[in-house]
């Protein structure tokens, strides 16, 4: 039987269409996915993301442990509260999960991992933490709410005490601060400004109702997916998984190659992949009528006239742009144009970098 977050009854009261999402009953939408998408781009929307897993790591050797566990390097995190995005890899360089890691104290780091990968993530982390004597605590006592959009931070501020407002004043992106019983982070999955707020489960219903009263509208999984796609953000299980290298998923920037003597899980395999070359993740734009869908084939010719085939990993109509966009994994050598097979039609598409909308505005496409 699917699990429920503490906000389940609130979603039902708001008219949500509930669906089973990796074993959790979650809101797909509250009436109109497109309206919810536009609200986040133009005003402020909120998402229940309590199905995600928060993991606290304690111990004197926690930093050393994470430098081995993760492809990005937590040595970069020197200011308490600073966070970074990273992959956790297997020995063959495949992505076990993508996650955010926060540096809170020298002996205290926090991870936020995906819901679909919860069990394998926890098993992997616990297994590798043991030699470092790091305590792994799963924070199932916390709920998580993302408030996103150009007015999100302003609307959240109306619910905070003066002390909490002072604690987060001037906070830059990718930071997290504990302010009383709220852990407030300037992170998100929409390409908009906003917060992801962790708080005790018993407080989250009241907090949700306060956000509603402040004019923040609820948004579901459907809008969350089109927002992250417009922002060019990966979804685990589509853009990457245990058989896909971060180098083939537009995540090369999350791999810290220096210092050369840092050994992290998957490094040897990644170095070989870097030397040999990998597939790449690109953006696709189709302004003609039709919708680019997951798993459709992408055909193109390289400069030598050789034919290649890739595949769409995520595709959808873009509510912000008014036409169809996609992310696709393709062999190296793709130019600016390709063709996607939609039923029995060959549709021309333009190839771009992943990322189509930033802060509510179209990227120069």
From Swiss-Prot:
GO terms for cellular component: cytosol; glycine cleavage complex. One of its GO terms (biological process) is glycine decarboxylation via glycine cleavage system. Disulfide bonds: none annotated. GO terms for molecular function: aminomethyltransferase activity; transaminase activity. The keyword Transferase applies. Keywords: Aminotransferase, Transferase. Its EC number is 2.1.2.10. NCBIfam families: gcvT, PRK00389.1. Belongs to the GcvT family. The glycine cleavage system is composed of four proteins: P, T, L and H. This is Aminomethyltransferase. It comes from Yersinia enterocolitica serotype O:8 / biotype 1B (strain NCTC 13174 / 8081).
